[in-house]
């Protein structure tokens, strides 16, 4: 469960390392987000000499959460960290690689490019 002020690790090579959520997309009253949800965030840490700088406002899709999510078959899945992948206006990833596992729910929510770039899909 991702809410305002949550810090997320960035799971791609776009140049950002850590982002801080400032808005969960999906309406003004929406409080929390989960895997596959789009968030607006501020870059808190970045790699030097890249396009994305500290303080930039970016859009990202959540790919891993510590809070477990229930699947339709009754199983649960959770990860060791909260992570996101930075995306552009067309919902395409800015980076060319995705690090760590991602949930297969991303493909169902229309982020098949991120799922195909990932090392593992759980």
Curated annotation (Swiss-Prot):
**UniProt keyword Translocase present:** no
Protein keywords? Ribonucleoprotein, Ribosomal protein, RNA-binding, rRNA-binding
GO terms in the biological process aspect are: translation
Q: Which Pfam family name is an example for this entry? A: Ribosomal_L14
- Domain of life the protein comes from: Bacteria
Has keyword rRNA-binding? Answer: yes
Q: Which GO terms describe its molecular function?
A: large ribosomal subunit rRNA binding; structural constituent of ribosome
Which Gene Ontology terms of cellular component type are present? cytosolic large ribosomal subunit
Q: Any idea what job this protein has?
A: Binds to 23S rRNA. Forms part of two intersubunit bridges in the 70S ribosome.
**Subunit-structure text:** Part of the 50S ribosomal subunit. Forms a cluster with proteins L3 and L19. In the 70S ribosome, L14 and L19 interact and together make contacts with the 16S rRNA in bridges B5 and B8.
- Family to which the UniProt record says this protein belongs: Belongs to the universal ribosomal protein uL14 family.
Name the record gives this protein:
Large ribosomal subunit protein uL14
């Amino acid at each position: 469960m991702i809410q305002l002020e949550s810090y997320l690790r960035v799971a791609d090579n776009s140049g950002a390392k850590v982002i801080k959520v400032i808005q969960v997309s999906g309406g003004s009253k929406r409080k929390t987000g989960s895997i596959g949800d789009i968030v607006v965030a501020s870059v808190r840490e970045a790699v030097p000499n890249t396009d994305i700088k500290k303080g930039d406002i970016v859009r990202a899709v959540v790919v891993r959460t510590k809070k477990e999510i229930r699947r339709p078959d009754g199983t649960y899945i959770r990860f060791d960290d909260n992570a996101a992948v930075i995306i552009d206006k067309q919902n395409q990833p800015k980076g060319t690689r995705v690090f760590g596992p991602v949930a297969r729910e991303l493909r169902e929510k229309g982020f098949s490019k991120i799922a195909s770039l990932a090392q593992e899909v759980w």
